[in-house]
Amino acid sequence: MAVGIFDSGLGGLTVLDAAQKRLPDVDFLYYGDNSHAPYGVRDAEDIYELTHKAVHDMWDRGCNLVILACNTASAAALRRMQEAGVPEGKRVLGVFVPLIEALTERQWGDNSPPREVAVKHVALFATPATVASRAFQRELAFRAIGVDVEAQACGGVVDAIEEGDMILAEALVKSHVDALLRKMPRPEAAILGCTHYPLMEDVFQKALGPDVQVFSQGRLVADSLAHYLERRPEMIGGGNAGYVTTGNANRVSSRATQFLRREITFEAA
């Protein structure tokens, strides 16, 4: 019984990598919708339909739990999928849940009124679609008061990373950080609201300065998943992993191997 990790492209591999290191005995299935990537420039309805199709495919492949390791999909599709009803014995969770738990210092199921939190000025770096959805701001507002969030849509960064052009990606990150700092000169914390961005975490940190706490998703999601699985020992397996893609399997395998710096072999979905 594998845990499913879904992303529109390769960014979710940062979440998978952290989860495998944290949970070496859990089986994982990674599903990349590479033929439709990137999601960040698509409209909300398109993102929902693509995500809905992929998640149902993963459930059919035996994944009782699917993590949307794509902030754009989480922002546009997660709540709608959950409200529409999930088949018995299946679950779908969003990747930004652990981020908001960490930022607000409260569990997702805590339904007490919003309260003051330590961090007051937060920079959010995400894809254009995630920024447009205002999902981070909405979920934060349910749990915290007095938090000022300044969002920066980071156009081009995902494309550069997917193409392996890290020089361009670094230049774009610096440009987007500069644009954010013109709007919010002194953020206390920064959310890397895309699973591709941990690969550029050092660039974000350097551009923001040492006094800004950077929240990156891989470790937080892995810790949250470990806590979830403590209550579900039946999901412990042999530590195997499978990789499927809607794109060109050979090309995606090559990119993924570069991405994680270890051999990754995808099969066609």
Swiss-Prot record:
Keywords on record: Cell shape, Cell wall biogenesis/degradation, Isomerase, Peptidoglycan synthesis
Superkingdom assignment: Bacteria
Catalytic residues (UniProt): 70 (proton donor/acceptor), 194 (proton donor/acceptor)
Catalysed transformations (reactions): L-glutamate = D-glutamate
GO biological process: cell wall organization; peptidoglycan biosynthetic process; regulation of cell shape
Listed GO MF terms: glutamate racemase activity
Residue sites binding substrate per the record: 7-8, 39-40, 71-72, 195-196
Top-level EC class: isomerase
Coiled-coil boundaries: none
InterPro entries, sorted: Asp/Glu/hydantoin_racemase (IPR015942), Asp/Glu_race (IPR001920), Asp/Glu_racemase_AS_1 (IPR018187), Glu_race (IPR004391)
Keyword Isomerase: yes
Entry EC number(s): 5.1.1.3
Pathway membership, UniProt: Cell wall biogenesis; peptidoglycan biosynthesis
Record-stated family: Belongs to the aspartate/glutamate racemases family.
Function: Provides the (R)-glutamate required for cell wall biosynthesis.
Protein name as it appears in the record: Glutamate racemase
Organism, scientific name: Ruegeria sp. (strain TM1040)
